Amino acid sequence: MMNQSITPPTHPPMSQRFRGYLPVVVDVETGGFNWNHHALLEIACIPIEMDDTGRLYPGEVTSTHVIPAPGTDIDPKSLEVTGIILDHPFRFAKEEKLALEHIFTPVRTTMKKYKCQRAILVGHNAHFDLNFLNAAVTRTAYKRNPFHQFSVFDTVTLAGMAYGQTVLARAVQAAGLDWNAADAHSAVYDAEKTAHLFCTITNIWPLMVAG
């Protein structure tokens, strides 16, 4: 018999919060700006989770360095920005298809946990990350891509609306979060900051509407 003293949650479950989509923050570091020609070099993803009160929080980060796919190019200037050393002995890069499987496996696990139908990419300038992700999926003929092919949540738009800031560093600081410029342009660091920014805005928004 159901305990009548238990108050059911008033917030929608994750499966309904974003119309069946699981938000997953993705950040990529690349060999340039052209996803059809430049190499994918590093990728990090963070599924967004929900606690018992309905508040969103960043889940566990999964990341990997990626071996440049055959036929892709690398602009040396991009390596100056990211600080990636391709032949570093501790880079431990994976071939592109194995890198995708490494990233996508925890995404599918979290989708199943929350009964979501698809993942939706969250990023800062999100279509940049999505285009490189889709290009890698196409190159490798990967068949189990959990992400929506074109829909995204872009924290550039969200931060511009919430704080009047569109640069990630300034948006993060405007949200009251810490930012270390020395750690920027790492896929893991940028993904973590983007995840906290997304959660901060989406958690505050219902309170602003109600108020």
From Swiss-Prot:
InterPro entries: Exonuclease_RNaseT/DNA_pol3, RNase_T, RNaseH-like_sf, RNaseH_sf. Keywords: Exonuclease, Hydrolase, Magnesium, Metal-binding, Nuclease, tRNA processing. Mg(2+) 2 binds at D27, E29, H185, D190. Binds two Mg(2+) per subunit. The active form of the enzyme binds two Mg(2+) ions in its active site. The first Mg(2+) forms only one salt bridge with the protein. NCBIfam families: RNaseT (TIGR01298). It comes from Xylella fastidiosa (strain Temecula1 / ATCC 700964). HAMAP family: RNase_T. GO terms for cellular component: cytosol. The keyword GTP-binding does not apply. Its EC number is 3.1.13.-. Residues 24-198 form the Exonuclease domain. One of its GO terms (biological process) is tRNA processing. GO terms for molecular function: 3'-5' exonuclease activity; magnesium ion binding; nucleic acid binding; RNA exonuclease activity, producing 5'-phosphomonoesters. The active site is at H185 (proton donor/acceptor). Homodimer. Belongs to the RNase T family. Trims short 3' overhangs of a variety of RNA species, leaving a one or two nucleotide 3' overhang. Responsible for the end-turnover of tRNA: specifically removes the terminal AMP residue from uncharged tRNA (tRNA-C-C-A). Also appears to be involved in tRNA biosynthesis. The record marks F33, F128, F150 as: Important for substrate binding and specificity. It is an enzyme of class 3 (hydrolase). Mg(2+) 1 binds at D27. Its cofactor is Mg(2+). This is Ribonuclease T.
